[in-house]
Amino acid sequence: LTNSYKFVGPSISSRLTQENFDLTAIKEKSPIYISLGTVLNQAIDFYKLCIKAFGNTEHTVVMSIGGQTQLDELGEIPENFIVKTYVPQTELLKYTKLFITHGGMNSTNEALYNGVPLILIPLSADQPIIAEQVTNIGAGISLQMQTLTANQLNEAANQVLNNPSIHKAVANIKESFQKSGGYQKAVDEIFKFKSQYGI
């Protein structure tokens, strides 16, 4: 590649949220985190499937259901589940052991930046391509929403959590992302370019 390109990796920053979420409650529990993002998150059947897959297991599960699903629509919530409308995702991912996600670009980058392996369930747009790339680099696995079962999701979680090669791949990507500089590196390169060419 020529000097015309500067790769600075993803730009990761905290997101503002109105949700009251106590991170101290989960810091020592290394939860599984489940979210379908902020756009196509009206998925009651999927959330119920997650409860069936992980309810009353040894895992602590944090599930973000967005603003289009009401908590009472999900029925009884198991004691090992924390279900919220929204959560501080970038902060939560620092303590997460597995992220089950739709595979949006932001969510995927934020997970890998924090060294979190992925189960991707792509829904639309670029998500199938992102899911394919994540599986190609060994940082997670991809499942299909249309045929997904609770047993399949539980088995996939165990597969990811107990696979050393996935954890190694994720650790390598985390190191690469965190060394790349992000938006601060981009700003530095822009000012360097301006200075170099007297702009």
How would you name each of these model-derived features?
Residues 1-199:
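Catalytic core of nucleotide-sugar-dependent glycosyltransferases
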